[in-house]
Structures are given as C-alpha cells and as structure tokens.
Amino acid sequence: MLLWLAEYLAQYHSGFLVVQYITLRGILSVLTALFIAFWVGPIMIRMLQEKQVGQAIRDDGPKSHLSKAGTPTMGGALILVAIVISTLLWGDLENRFVWITLGVLFVFGAVGWVDDWRKVVEKNPRGLPARWKYLWLSVGALGAGCALFFTAQSPVETQLIVPFFKSVAINMGWFYIVLTYFVINGTSNAVNLTDGLDGLAIMPTVLVGGALGIFAYAGGHAEFATYLQIPYVAGAGELVIISAALCGAGLGFLWFNAYPAQVFMGDVGALSLGAVLGVMAVIVRQEIVLFIMGGVFVMETVSVMLQVGSFKLTGRRIFRMAPIHHHFELKGWPEPKIIVRFWIITVILVLVGLATLKIR
C-alpha cells in the first residue's frame, strides 16, 4: 500500500524511490509487526483474561502443567494481525505470491480460530470435528497448490530442487500440487504439535521463517540466483516482506509467551504459521531445505507417529509421552532447559540449511 503511495510521490521527489528496495521495506516490515505486537499484546491478553478464554490442561499430562490452567490462549491472533497489517503496508500488493501466502494464512488461521473457540469458549473438548478440520485445511493447501501451479511463469517453479547438488531438479508435473498439499499441511500440523511448551514453537518458527526470507531474497534476484545456482523465481523476493513481518510479530509474541507464559498461541497461531512456512518453502523451491531447517518440527511429528504406531502394533510406548518434549519433561528436565535446547538445535539446523546456498 505504501509502495503505491511512494511511487506516486516519487514524481514530486525522487527520494521516495528508496521505498522500492525490498531490503528497506523488509526492515520496516519487521519493525512494524514488532511494534503492533508490543502495542496490541497487553490489550489482547487483558481481553482474553476478562472473557476467561483460558487454556484447558490435560489431566494425563506432566503435573508441572497444571499451574498453566487458565492461561489465556488464542494469542496467535495477535501474530496474524501484525503480519497482515505489516504486509499490507509494505508489500507489493500486485504480487501473486503475497496474496497466495496471505490466503493460506487466513484459511489456516480461521480453522485454528474455530477449533480454539469451540474448545475454550464453548467448552467442547473435541474442538472442531476432525473431518471438518482436515477438510478445510486440505481446501487451503490444495487451493494454494493449484494457484501456484496454474500461475507458474517458468518450469523451475514446479520442479523439486535437490540441495547440495548442482542442477539436480525433478519435474513434478501435476504431482506438484500433491507435493504442495503435503508440505503445507505437514508443516502446519508439525508446528501445532511442537506448540506444547512456553515459547517452544514460536522461536523455531521465527528462525526458519527468517531463513526462508533469505532464500526468497536470493531466489527472487536473477543475478544472485544465478551466482548461487539456486532457482530464480521472479517475484519471490516480495516474500521477504512477509518473512520479516513473521519475524517481527513472532518476536513480539515471544515477549509475552516466554516462560512463564502470559498467553498461548493456540491453534489459530500454530496452524497458520506452520502453513506459511510451508507455502514460502514451496514458492522458493526449498521444500527439502525446509525439512532440514525445521528438524525440531520433524522430530516432534515423528515421535508422535512412532508412539502411536508402536502402541498399536506392540502395546508398548517408545516414549514416556509424545510429542517428545513431554518425554523430556517426564524425565525431569526443567521446561526452560528443553525450550532453549530445542532453540539451539534449530539454530544449528538453520545454519545447515543456509549452507546449501553455497555448498553445491
């Protein structure tokens, strides 16, 4: 929005042309989202407390969690508001990737909102029925896949890129839509599973989102993409604005979500943020790198799959409790130690992912 205004004002003063630079708009985007989160956060927390929108705690979970009962949830809406406002202010609203990503954010956020509302306001422990939940999540993921597939402007936009190797790309054809579906839905649910401790999910989300912004900046610049031998996707650079907004909003939310948390993200935040990571990775053709950088999300998801599979096949559990962060809690690890160690793992994995820019 402000980009249009700057372009108009540039005819009166050339200094306004500086707003065209993605780097400047990225910085302004992160600061705007951070400011909104700091400003709106206390207001939203107070409103949630007044309306008694508090988190219900499982009786069979770690006993240390019982003290968290009643902590306001659905705070992820704060992140979404900050991301959307910042993106609309500083993004190029004629860019298709901006609208596709915001569309995914809206659909997954809406599903998460309804699920949270039914659980904490209507006191329905089942939340949104699973069949309806996954129907609408599938609609959002498949819709994004179709939109990206049918608006692709070059063959590379629908190829699967293998990191660490030069010119290794697999033509996906129509299977690209299926891949997009699994990447978006898989990442969404993985982040949701990770969101079980104070600040555990949001910091890895910020780190991975920021790294994807670097890939978007490089991949959206023809010269950088050629030099680094990564896919050039025209227009992908605008994802830097969304990535920056995600980082700013996420850090602002972490201010209130850090241990001991004043507010929880809820499904409205976890499902939507995971989906945004997925769609950004698809757009910049870095799905495999997302799998590497989001290793904590993968570990949490695999731990649940192994736990369920083992119990059904043998009647025995591999972990004391799944997802795996609860396993460490029941082993006696303090919650802050688990959180920080998972953050450290994410930093390492993000650096490995960024190394693929040069190691080919």
Swiss-Prot record:
Keyword terms, alphabetized: Cell cycle, Cell division, Cell inner membrane, Cell membrane, Cell shape, Cell wall biogenesis/degradation, Magnesium, Membrane, Metal-binding, Peptidoglycan synthesis, Transferase, Transmembrane, Transmembrane helix
InterPro entries: Glycosyl_transferase_4 (IPR000715), PNAcMuramoyl-5peptid_Trfase (IPR003524), PNAcMuramoyl-5peptid_Trfase_CS (IPR018480)
CDD domains in UniProt: GT_MraY (cd06852)
Localization annotation: Cell inner membrane
Essential cofactor(s): Mg(2+)
TM spans (from-to): 27-47, 73-93, 97-117, 132-152, 164-184, 199-219, 236-256, 263-283, 288-308, 337-357
Pathway(s) of this molecule: Cell wall biogenesis; peptidoglycan biosynthesis
Family of the protein in this entry: Belongs to the glycosyltransferase 4 family. MraY subfamily.
Protein name as it appears in the record: Phospho-N-acetylmuramoyl-pentapeptide-transferase
Annotated gene: mraY
